[in-house]
Amino acid sequence: MKAFIVILSIAIVLLLIVSIKETSAKDCKQECVKRYTKGDLTNFLKAEYEPKNRGGICYCEFTCHVKFYIYLKHEMD
């Protein structure tokens, strides 16, 4: 029974980590587009998110050879 609870706890923690990373990657893409094109996705090529302590680094790239980094901070509750 204790092993089941431990495995369940680990699974829940991993699920939370994955969902936070997915949300952060989505935020990364939205920030790239908002800051450079004011919401226009026409020239958007890719956004990559690398998590760090209390936030992460977002790499933005557009088809017109514009590339830049954004530092995202996430509030800790």
UniProtKB/Swiss-Prot annotation:
Q: How is it modified after translation?
A: Contains 2 disulfide bonds.
At the top level, the lineage of the source is Eukaryota
Q: Which residues form the signal peptide?
A: 1-25
Localisation: Secreted
Q: In which tissues is it expressed?
A: Expressed by the venom gland.
Q: Which UniProt keywords apply?
A: Disulfide bond, Neurotoxin, Secreted, Signal, Toxin
According to the UniProt entry, its GO molecular function terms are: toxin activity
**Family listed:** Belongs to the scolopendra neurotoxin 3 family.
Major location, coarse class?
secreted
> Where does this protein come from, organism-wise?
Scolopendra subspinipes
Propeptide positions: 26-46
Task: Tell me what this protein is called.
Answer: Putative neurotoxin 1
Tell me a GO cellular component.
Answer: extracellular region
